[in-house]
């Protein structure tokens, strides 16, 4: 990490991926990935850089928006628990989560307002206030869809959280 810092790096990202299936992600998977993200974040902060913590619940599959909300909530709660255990300074961390979306094969689609409300509600219930910012990933959405959803989230944002995007190639 010191070498990267000397080269000018000030942020570093680590990603953990969670698939929603009938019995997945398992509690063991959630805990193991949260621990790995937290260890990485601690190492990054020790190197005087900002960790970008990316717990991504994939939109692949036919799960409902409510199932995504449920799984994402569990994932975020466990991630923040592990970040605290590992003495990661939350005020020096950026969260890069998925938005709350139905699976790409789900027959019941969600509109932008529903996605925004569920995403904001999930973060309000799981994310400590010390976290200064959220940089959403597109997570399989087109850049246009993701941007519309981010705009809707920002319009109803009644928190001190700062929301932005981190997508595009």
Regions found by a protein language model. Name each.
Residues 2-83:
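Helix-rich catalytic cores of soluble enzyme domains
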Residues 63-169:
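Active-site capping/gating regions of soluble enzymes
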